[in-house]
Amino acid sequence: MKPVWIKHAKELATIAGENGARKGKDMSELAIIEDGSVWIEDGKIAAVGTTAELEEQFANRTHEADIVDATGRLVTPGLVDPHTHIVYGGSREREFEMRLEGATYMDIMNAGGGIHATCRMTREATEDELIEQSSRRLDSFAKHGVTTVEGKSGYGLDLETEMKQLRVAKRLNEQHAVEIIPTFMGAHAVPNEYKGNEDAFVDLIIDEMLPVVAKEKLAIFNDVFCEKDVFTPEQSERILEAGKKLGLTPKIHADEIVSYGGAELAAKVGAISAEHLLKASDQGIKDMAEAGVIGCLLPATALFLREEAAKGRQMIDSGMAVAISTDCNPGSSPTTSMPLVMNLACISMRLTPAEALVAATINAASAIKVENRVGSLEVGKQGDLVMWDIGSYQELQYLFGVNHVDKVWKKGQQIVG
C-alpha cells in the first residue's frame, strides 16, 4: 500500500491530547493545526504537523505517496458511532405514522410492535439477508464520515437469534471497511412468551446466553434496557454483574422514558457508558461523573420521538465525559448521519461545536474502548480520517442537513470519494 500524504488542510482538527475520554473544558480542545498535514503509512498515522514540517520530514519520499490536496478543507478523525443496532431485519416505517397519530413508544411496544416486531423479522431473516441489509447501512455510515461503529444484538431475544446477530456482526467486521465493535444485548426487551415471568427470562440470559457469548468471544460489552415495564434495576444489575464475571464490560440503556435509577446503577456497576439518559436525575448525573461513566447521548432519538433531549450541558458542566451517537435502529432513530447528530447535540443539548466533535470522536471511541487506535489524529493510531468540503469545524455543525463529506479513509485506504 502506498503512503497517503494529505496536505494544506485549512483546519486539521487532530483532537490530540491525553488519551481517553475528555471531560469539562477539555471537551473544547481540538488541537487544530492550520495548513495541516498527515502522513499515513501501512494503515497508520506516521506523522502529523504543518505542511511545511511534513514537507521537510519526508522530503526524500514525497514521490512515493498518493498526495491529497486539502486546500480550503477541514480534516478530522473518522467519526465514531458508539451506539447502534445495525444488524436487524425488516423495517418499521408504519410506526412513524402511528406516533404522529398519537401512539407512544410503550403503546406501540405493548401492541406487539416496536422491538417485538423487529425481533420477528430478524428471527425470520437468514444470516446472508442480514449481511446484505446491514452492509447497506454501513455503506451509508461511511458516506457520512463514520469509520467505526458499535453494533448491538437485541433483536432476537432467544439464544439462536441473538447469536445469529452477533455472528453477522463478526462477519461484517471481516468483510466491510467500517469497523464494528460488538455488544450483546439480549436484555433489550422481555419476549412475549415470558410476559409475567420476567425473572425466568433473566435466568435464561444469565445461564444460557451470556456463557455462549463469552465462550465464542462474540461481544466485548453486555448491555441491558433498564426501564419501567422492561427490566428493573435489580434485574439489570444481575445481568450486568453476570456479564462482568465472564469478562464482558457493562453498558446500560438508562432513564430513557422515566427516571428509574438507571444512571445510579451505571455508576454502581462501573459501566463504561450509560445510554439515552433523557430522564436521568441530578443525583444520577453526579454519581456517573464521580464514577467516570461516559454519558452516551442520542439526540436524534429524542427528536424522532418528540421528547426533550438529555441534559448534555449539565452533564459536561458536572464533570461527565459525554459521547454522542445516532442510535441507528428501525424504530426510534433510523439514521446513519453523525453530522446531523452533532448539529442536534448543539441545538437540543447546548453543546458547542467543538464539544460535539469531541463527543463524536475521541469520547465516542472511549465509550467502546477503542480510543487507543481511533478517535484522534496522532502518530501510531489508525489512518482513519475525513476530509470535508468546508473549511472550519464550526461549519460542520452550522451548515446542517447537508452531507459535507468529501473523502474518507479507513486504515489508510480511501473508502469514500
Region roles according to the model:
Residues 61, 65-133:
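Metal-associated gating/positioning segment near the N- to mid-region
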Residues 62, 398-408:
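Short, compositionally biased
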Residues 249, 259-376, 388-393, 400-402, ...:
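Active-site-adjacent C-terminal substructures of enzyme catalytic domains
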Residues 2, 13-76:
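Histidine-rich, glycine-flanked metal-binding segment
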Residues 5, 64-69, 182, 408:
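Conserved beta-strand scaffold positions in the cores of enzyme catalytic domains, especially
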Residues 9, 38, 43, 72, ...:
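Divalent metal-coordination and catalytic microenvironments
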Residues 114-134, 139-140, 147-260:
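Metal-coordinating catalytic core of metallo-dependent amide/deamination hydrolases
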